Amino acid sequence: MRIGRSFGSCSAEGALLALLVIALIAATAAADDFAYGRRLYLDKAQCSYCHGWAADGAGETQSNGGAANLRQSFLNREQLIEVIMCGRPATPMPHYDEAAYTDNRCYGMTEAELGTSVPALPPGATLQKREVEAIADYLLAKFIGRGAVTREECEEVFGTGGRACSQYPAKP
């Protein structure tokens, strides 16, 4: 009888340990995905050039200007993916899908229908769908619908106590 109870106890402990391991693996994978999306946003796709490091539309002074403030956006994941893949016609927002507008995958329109309004393809920066998904997930986790930039967010990027971050308010 005691053996059965001990075995039952081990099973419960084993199940708890297995759940803990799964949670740890999931948390590590989420952190890796977040870092991957961030690298793509900042470096490969260079979204920050126009949208800014904090996705607030305050990009580099040399950019075309007028980039969307993604912090005020309420686009869902699918909408973000479409905008990144397809760009925004008649705006400086480029498309990152090499085959965009060759068929109706982008907003149900083709290049023939758009004429000169087809968004530009950024030189050397086409993205795979999984890369676009990683950027969308990063934006949703960090910026979409978040309101004003905070000092804490700035310090995550530029380090604690930096002069550049003093212009932002602390989190309430």
Describe the residue ranges of each PLM region:
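Sec/Tat signal peptide C-region and signal peptidase I cleavage site
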Residues: 25-33
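Mature N-terminal segment immediately following signal peptide/propeptide cleavage
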Residues: 39
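Gly/Gly-Pro-rich "capping" loops immediately C-terminal to redox-active cysteine motifs
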Residues: 54-117
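Flexible coil segments in periplasmic/lumen-exposed cytochrome c-class electron-transfer proteins
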Residues: 32-35, 43-45, 53, 94-172
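Short, cysteine/histidine-rich loop/knuckle motifs that typically chelate Zn2+
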Residues: 49
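Bacterial N-terminal signal peptides
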Residues: 14-26
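Low-complexity, intrinsically disordered segments with a bias for serine/threonine
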Residues: 10-15, 121
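N-terminal secretory signal peptides that target proteins for export/translocation
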Residues: 1-11
